[in-house]
Design a protein with these regions (language model features):
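Rossmann-fold cofactor-recognition segment
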Residues: 47-61
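C-terminal helical subdomain
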Residues: 161-164, 168-216
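Conserved NAD(P)H cofactor-binding loop of Rossmann-fold oxidoreductase domains
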Residues: 77-86
């Protein structure tokens, strides 16, 4: 079920309803993003296990099926993507590949397959993370994926047509994940969920493109 509201946003035709796909909208960060955006927008939640539409971003066929089912849309925000978390000393190439295939290529796939379908002046907002700038030993796979996403966003922004924008949100350690990941991040304060969700809102409702919006 979608959630409907109204919007007055100069990035689109003012006063029109903005339809936003939130991939990973049932996850920790995605839930906060959906809660914030659904007050003013028509939000469609897409996820691998739950949501309005099922999608596995590591599968081209699944992403194409998602777009066919949803139809027209004005923005896509992704808060999904897996990567291996574990000691670098024992990491295998298969474990490293998880982050490349899911978090990195999965998000790029959303853009490549959706760029011709999104409304004019629409936007893509991907997710990377602080671990690219401030890595921890257990998250090498995350750092690799995050770096690739940042590079893609900056490069793609130069060539996207029809005034379509693209940005990435780089969240810090989310408040709702602190209990799980806090021990691996000594001295790092958790970031409130609203602050992270608001970074997605800035990307979608603003004018910027090719930027990494840091929420940490």
């Amino acid at each position: 079920m979608t959630r409907r509201g109204t919007v007055a946003d100069d990035s689109f035709e003012g006063g029109t309803l903005v339809r936003i796909i939130v991939v990973g909208g049932a996850g920790t960060i995605g839930t906060a993003v959906v809660e914030l955006l659904s007050a003013r927008h028509d939000v469609v939640v897409a996820g691998r296990r739950s949501g309005d539409v099922r999608v596995d971003i590591s599968s081209r066929d699944s992403v194409q099926s998602m777009y066919r089912r949803i139809g027209s849309f004005d923005a896509l925000a992704c808060a999904a993507g897996e990567a291996h978390f574990g000691p670098f000393e024992t990491m295998t190439d298969e474990e490293l590949e998880l982050g490349v295939q899911s978090k990195l290529l999965g998000q790029l796939r959303l853009v490549l397959l959706g760029r011709s379908l999104i409304s004019e002046a629409g936007s893509f907002t991907l997710i990377c993370g602080y671990i690219f700038d401030d890595p921890i030993p257990e998250a090498t796979s995350f750092a690799v994926a995050n770096g690739g996403i940042e590079g893609f966003v900056r490069a793609a922004a130069l060539r996207l047509e029809r005034r379509v924008r693209i940005n990435a949100v780089s969240p810090g350690m989310a408040q709702d994940s602190y209990e799980q990941f806090g021990p691996f991040n000594p001295g790092r304060a958790p970031v409130p969920m609203l602050e992270i969700a608001s970074a997605f809102e800035r990307s979608i409702e603003g004018w910027r493109t090719g930027e990494i919006i840091r929420a940490w």
